[in-house]
Swiss-Prot record:
Residues 175-355 form the Tyr recombinase domain. This is Integrase. Belongs to the 'phage' integrase family. One of its GO terms (biological process) is DNA recombination.
C-alpha cells in the first residue's frame, strides 16, 4: 500500500509538490525536470492544473474566455471555402484554378481548422519546413504564396489584422533544369531529322515566337491577320499580336518562312499539325523533342532541357538581337506600364508587338 500523503500535500493536483520550507515545485512527468512556483499555494495549484491540462490534452489548450470570445471567429478551413469562391471570381484560367486548389488541399492537410487569428507563424513554418525537408522547396514556395494570398483576402474582409505567413521564410527553390544554347539547339534540330517533320517546324516556331508549347499547339491559320499572329496565352490570359516578319538571326530562322513550310508540308487547321493534319498535344511535342535530344548525344549538368527551354532560348537571343524589353514583351511579361494598360483595357485589346 502506498504511503499516505500529508495534510499539506493531500489536495495538490498531480505533479505539484511542496518542500519542507513551504516552496512549491511542478515536476514535468515527461522528463522529471522540476520548475519552481513560489510559496503562494493558490497560484501554484492554478499553474499546475493549467500545465496538466496542456500536457495531457495532446493539443494546444485554449482558455475558456478565449473560446467564448472566438465563437464568431472564422476558422481556417471555412475561410478557405470562401477563398475558393474569391479565386473563381478573379476570372483566372481553369488550369491555374486547378493549381490553386491543389495548394489549398495541402494547406487543409497541414494546418488545423482553428480560428484564423489563432493560426501561428510557428505552425505555418512547421508545415512549410516539412515540404522543404522532403526536398520539395518549390512546392513549399507555392503553398506559402497561396496561403499568404488567402490571409491578405481575410484581412481585406476584416477577419484578421495580421498576415502571419509574411514572417515565414520564403523557400529557395533551385532551378535544376539546364539552359539550352544555340549550338545545342542546332544539334538537337539535326538529330530531329529522323523524327516526324512537324517536330523541326515546331522547334523553329517555338524559338521565333517565344511562346509556350501549349500555345503553339493551339495556333491556327485563322489567327494570322494582316501580318500578325494573334496569341492569347493559356497560362496568363495575356493577348499579344506577333509580327510574322520576325526572324532569329543567330539561328537563321524566319517566321514567315517557317509558316510557309508549315502550310505546305503540314496543311492542317492548326499551324503545327500531325502527318494526318490533326492537332498535336503539348505532351506529344515534348515527348518527341526529348527523343531527339537523347539522339543528339548531348549531355547536360542538372536536369536536361525540355521543349519549354526553347522559350528561354528565344528570350536570350532576342535580348541580344533587339533588346531585353522586346524579349520580355514577346514572352508576355508585363512591365508596370503595360500592366496598367491591361487593367484599363479590361482584356479587350490586343497588345501589338513592333520590331524596333
Amino acid at each position: 500500500m502506498g504511503r499516505r500523503r500529508s495534510h499539506e500535500r493531500r489536495d495538490l493536483p498531480p505533479n505539484l509538490y511542496i518542500r519542507n520550507n513551504g516552496y512549491y515545485c511542478y515536476r514535468d512527468p515527461r522528463t522529471g525536470k522540476e520548475f519552481g512556483l513560489g510559496r503562494d499555494r493558490r497560484i501554484a495549484i492554478t499553474e499546475a492544473i493549467q500545465a496538466n491540462i496542456e500536457l495531457f490534452s495532446g493539443h494546444k489548450h485554449k482558455p475558456l474566455t478565449a473560446r467564448i470570445n472566438s465563437d464568431n471567429s472564422v476558422t481556417l478551413h471555412s475561410w478557405l471555402d470562401r477563398y475558393e469562391k474569391i479565386l473563381a471570381s478573379r476570372g483566372i484560367k481553369q488550369k491555374t484554378l486547378i493549381n490553386y486548389m491543389s495548394k489549398i488541399k495541402a494547406i487543409r492537410r497541414g494546418l488545423p481548422d482553428a480560428p484564423l487569428e489563432d493560426i501561428t507563424t510557428k505552425e505555418i513554418a512547421a508545415m512549410l519546413n516539412g515540404y522543404i525537408d522532403e526536398g520539395k522547396a518549390a512546392s513549399a514556395k507555392l503553398i506559402r504564396s497561396t496561403l499568404s494570398d488567402a490571409f491578405r483576402e481575410a484581412i481585406a474582409e476584416g477577419h484578421i489584422t495580421t498576415n502571419h505567413v509574411a514572417a515565414t521564410r520564403a523557400a529557395k527553390s533551385e532551378v535544376r533544369r539546364s539552359r539550352l544554347t544555340a549550338d545545342e539547339y542546332l544539334k538537337i534540330y539535326q538529330a530531329a531529322e529522323s523524327s516526324p517533320c512537324w517536330l523541326r517546324l515546331a522547334m523553329e516556331l517555338a524559338v521565333v515566337t517565344g511562346q509556350r508549347v501549349g500555345d503553339l499547339c493551339e495556333m491556327k491559320w485563322s489567327d494570322i491577320v494582316d501580318g500578325y499572329l494573334y496569341v492569347e496565352q493559356s497560362k496568363t490570359g495575356v493577348k499579344i499580336a506577333i509580327p510574322t516578319a520576325l526572324h532569329i538571326d543567330a539561328l537563321g530562322i524566319s517566321m514567315k518562312e517557317t509558316l510557309d513550310k508549315c502550310k505546305e508540308i503540314l496543311g492542317g487547321e492548326t499551324i503545327i499539325a500531325s502527318t494526318r493534319r490533326e492537332p498535336l498535344s503539348s505532351g506529344t511535342v515534348s515527348r518527341y523533342f526529348m527523343r531527339a535530344r537523347k539522339a543528339s548525344g548531348l549531355s547536360f549538368e542538372g536536369d536536361p532541357p525540355t521543349f519549354h527551354e526553347l522559350r528561354s532560348l528565344s528570350a536570350r537571343l532576342y535580348e541580344k538581337q533587339i533588346s531585353d524589353k522586346f524579349a520580355q514583351h514577346l514572352l508576355g511579361h508585363k512591365s508596370d506600364t503595360m500592366a496598367s494598360q491591361y487593367r484599363d483595357d479590361r482584356g479587350r485589346e490586343w497588345d501589338k508587338i513592333e520590331i524596333k
